[in-house]
Amino acid sequence: MNLPAHTALFTPSWHAELELGYGRFYDCTRPTQRRHKGPLRVQKHLYAEGPEVCQHIIVHPPGGIAGGDRLDISVNVGAHAWAQLTSPGAAKWYRAASPAFQQLELHVQPGATLEWLPQETIVFSNAQAELTTRIELHGDARLCYWDVVALGRPASGERFEHGHFQSHLDIRRDGTLLWHERQRIIGADGLLDSPIGLDGKTVFATLLLTGDVDSDLLEVCRSLSMPSPVRGNLTQLPGLIVARCLADEALHARAWLIEIWKRLRPALLGREAVMPRIWNT
C-alpha cells in the first residue's frame, strides 16, 4: 500500500550504541575497543593503506532511521594511531511523527589522526532529523571530517516540503573552540530557494581539515574543473580549512569533496589519498 507523503510511518524505535577505540602498537593501528548495542556495528577492520591506517566501515542494518530512533556513536583514537571511518551507503532519515536523533562523540589524542568520511545523508520529506556532533582534539591531533546532506528525493519527485533537519557541530582543541555550527532547516522554508540559502540546490556538503596550506594549493583546489554543476569554495581559517559546496545530486557533491581530499590529504596528513573500495560498490 502506498501512503500519502504526509502520513507518518509507525515502526518500533531503536536505541543503538557503538563505541570504538584505536591504539598504536609499533607501526600498526589496531582496534582496542568495539562495543555495540542494537543495530549498529562495524565490519572487520581493513588495512588498504598498510598497517598504519585502520579502516572501519560502520553499518546500520535497518537501512534507515525513523521516528524515535537514537544512534549514539563514540570514537577514541589513541595517541599516534590513525583511524578512517566510512559507511557502505547513504544514511536515510525516514518521514516520522516524532524526532530521531544521532549523537557523535569523537576524541582524537595527541599525534593521532581521525578521518570521518561517511557517505551521504538523505533526509526524506516529513523526517525530523536531529544530529549532534562533538569532536575533541588533544595536542597536535589531526582531523578530516566531512558531511554530505541531501534534502528530499528529487529523482522521485519529492521535495523537502515538511519536517526538519537540525545539526549541531562543535570542534575543540584542548578545550578551545575551533569550529561551531548550528543549522535548522524547515521543510518548504524560503531559504531552500533563496540566493542567500541553498538557491534551489538540494544537496549541501562540508569538509573540515585541520592544518594550514599555502595560497597556491588553495587556488588549485578552487580552480578544480568538475564535470557536473557543483558550486564550491574553500576558506583557510587559523588551523582549519573549510570547504563547502552546493549541488543537485549527492554523487556530484561527494565527487567534489573527494577531489579536494585527494589534494589536501598529502599536504596536511602526509599520505596520498586512497579511496576506500566500499565507495565503488
Swiss-Prot record:
Annotated coiled-coil segments of the chain: none
The entry's keywords: Chaperone, Cytoplasm, Nickel insertion
Keyword Nucleotide-binding: no
Short name of one Pfam family: UreD
Localization of this protein: Cytoplasm
One GO MF term attached to the UniProt entry: nickel cation binding
InterPro entries associated with the record: UreD
Record-level GO cellular component terms: cytoplasm
Role summary: Required for maturation of urease via the functional incorporation of the urease nickel metallocenter.
Subunit: UreD, UreF and UreG form a complex that acts as a GTP-hydrolysis-dependent molecular chaperone, activating the urease apoprotein by helping to assemble the nickel containing metallocenter of UreC. The UreE protein probably delivers the nickel.
HAMAP family per record: UreD
Family per record: Belongs to the UreD family.
Protein name: Urease accessory protein UreD 2
Origin organism lineage: Bacteria, Pseudomonadati, Pseudomonadota, Gammaproteobacteria, Pseudomonadales
Gene of this entry: ureD2
